[in-house]
A protein has these predicted regions:
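C-terminal subdomain of the subtilisin-like protease fold in secreted/lumenal serine endopeptidases
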Residues: 11, 302-309, 321, 418-460
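Subtilisin-like serine protease catalytic core
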Residues: 201-214, 219-233, 241-284, 300-304, ...
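Residues within mature, well-folded domains
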Residues: 33-125
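N-terminal domain-start motif of subtilase-like serine proteases
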Residues: 186-214, 238-241, 358-362, 446
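Autoinhibitory propeptides
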Residues: 121-190
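Substrate-binding/access-modulating region of protease and related hydrolase catalytic domains
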Residues: 275-353, 397-407
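Bacterial N-terminal signal peptides
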Residues: 19-28
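Extracellular S/T/G-rich loop segment that most often corresponds to the catalytic His/Ser-adjacent loop
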Residues: 218, 332-418, 422
Length: 460
């Protein structure tokens, strides 16, 4: 009997132990099923989650931040593209592209990322929202703070930085109590539309370019911007099929013929979109040939008298001899061609001193690029222009180059042709030089005196 009692007790103990083991196994399975046991995520999963959480974001994430998240890269390459330095990083199933403007010391920031050949949405088409003040260091003075939200930041200690940064009408600012004293971006943007140096006074006198055609040869254009859409008489594309709107054309058009920003707001605009990124002069030559043909057409109501091209790379490009022939032909047909080349007309840039009278030549300082003695200086920096990002978007530029100065001079030439249609192209250049007023920074263009001198040539 005792033996059977021990046997039954042992069987019971085994059953209890087995049950406990089964319960433990099921508990472990349930625990794992609920995801409570950490598993190692793949780099692809880490990237997807970081993008979803906003930890990886367009123009905010740096290469070091990505490496801290994913570890050492599998491969990286560095190359130049235009004015940018492009850094490409590769991880298993991941390709990442960073970029920075070479002329500035800002870090490279994220431009594009793909996982398993599928591009991720990192916010390229959305406004960039700065998370903290350190994010300010990631933006350069070329693109600046356009379409950036700074609403979450306290900017009172960043006046020096803000004075170097362009921005646009889409930039979101914090309240006035979080801005530096005296810094008013809305006023800067509006004041920057004024061409300055008495141009608007000439407009009130009826000298606004009416009846005269100006051709701008540049990159593909946002055609419906409210600043110049109603001045666009003709648009023709040459060898740019499939190329989207570029940033260069809208500012140039608005400086020349813009209704609020322009020197000649009533002129007729002829626009030729060309591949300026190709080292070949033929597209410019072809455009000038077509303009001469248009001028010969009796149905052309506003003949083109001025051409504005914001580049000066012609000697370094193919078909330079053909280009020189085109310039000669244009002059023979009474057309003044204004470019950024300095072979026939020396000119340079001014930047407006904000808060000063824009019509006073003493309210300007020299631009960032040096010029030779005797160069005629025209406003370019601290100006507002049309933006390529939307039909009602405007950009306030800080420093500017020759590209913004050429259309200003071209606009003045349009005014000259309105006042005296018979004036020779060379005479326009001579009078711009003779009527410039001397200031502490150099010879500043003087539109009113220039137009008076043009009128005097008509009377002679």
């Amino acid at each position: 009997m005792r033996f059977f009692s021990l046997y039954n007790a042992l069987k019971m103990q085994i059953r209890i132990t087995t049950a406990l083991i089964l319960i433990l196994c099921f508990s472990i399975i349930a625990f794992c099923t609920e995801g409570n046991v950490p598993t190692k995520s793949s780099p692809a999963d880490i990237v997807r989650q970081a993008v979803a959480d906003g930890k990886i974001a367009y123009k905010l994430t740096t290469p070091d931040e990505l490496k801290a998240l994913l570890g050492p890269v599998e491969n990286q390459t560095l190359r130049n593209s235009g004015g940018m330095e492009i850094l490409e990083l590769k991880y298993p199933d991941i390709q990442v592209i960073f970029g920075r403007m070479r002329d500035y010391s800002t870090p490279s920031t994220l431009l594009w990322i793909a996982v398993k050949d599928k591009q991720l949405d990192i916010g390229q088409e959305r406004q960039i929202v700065l998370r903290n003040e350190d994010d300010l260091k990631k933006f350069d003075p070329f693109w600046g703070l356009a379409n950036v939200s700074l609403a979450n930041l306290d900017l009172r200690g960043h006046l020096q930085l803000l004075q170097t940064m362009p921005f646009d009408s889409q930039t979101k600012w914090p309240g006035p109590d979080k801005l530096p004293d005296g810094f008013d971006p809305v006023k800067l943007l509006e004041d920057g539309k004024n061409p300055g140096l008495g141009i608007r006074a000439l407009h009130k006198q009826g000298v606004d370019g009416r009846g005269v055609g100006i051709a701008i040869i540049d990159q593909p254009l946002l055609k419906d911007h409210i600043e110049y859409a109603d001045r666009l008489t003709r648009y023709e594309a040459i060898d740019v099929d499939g190329v989207p709107v570029q940033m260069h054309g809208p500012p140039i058009c608005s400086i020349a013929v813009g209704k609020t920003c322009g020197v000649a707001p009533s002129a007729s605009l002829y626009y030729f979109a060309v591949p300026m990124w190709k080292p070949d002069n033929m597209p410019y030559c072809d455009a000038i040939d077509k303009l001469i043909q248009l001028n010969a057409d009796p149905n052309t109501t506003a003949r083109v008298r001025v051409v504005s091209i914001s580049t000066g790379m012609f000697p370094q490009q193919a078909n330079f001899d053909r280009w020189k022939d085109a310039l000669k032909k244009a002059e023979e047909n009474g057309i003044l061609v204004v470019t950024c080349a300095q072979d026939s007309f020396q000119y340079g840039m001014l930047a407006r001193n904000n808060g000063k009278d824009p019509d006073d030549p003493a309210s300007y300082r020299s631009g960032i690029y040096g010029v030779g003695p005797g160069a005629v200086l025209v406003p370019a920096g601290n100006r507002t222009t049309a933006s390529h990002t939307g039909r009602d978007v405007y950009t306030f530029w800080r420093e500017a180059g020759m590209s913004w100065a050429a259309p200003y001079l071209a606009g003045l030439a349009v005014l000259a042709y309105q006042v005296n249609p018979e004036i020779e192209p060379k005479t326009i250049i001579t009078l711009l030089q003779k009527t410039a007023v001397k200031t502490s920074v150099g010879d500043v263009v003087q539109p009113a005196d220039f137009i008076k001198a043009v009128r005097d040539t008509k009377h002679k």
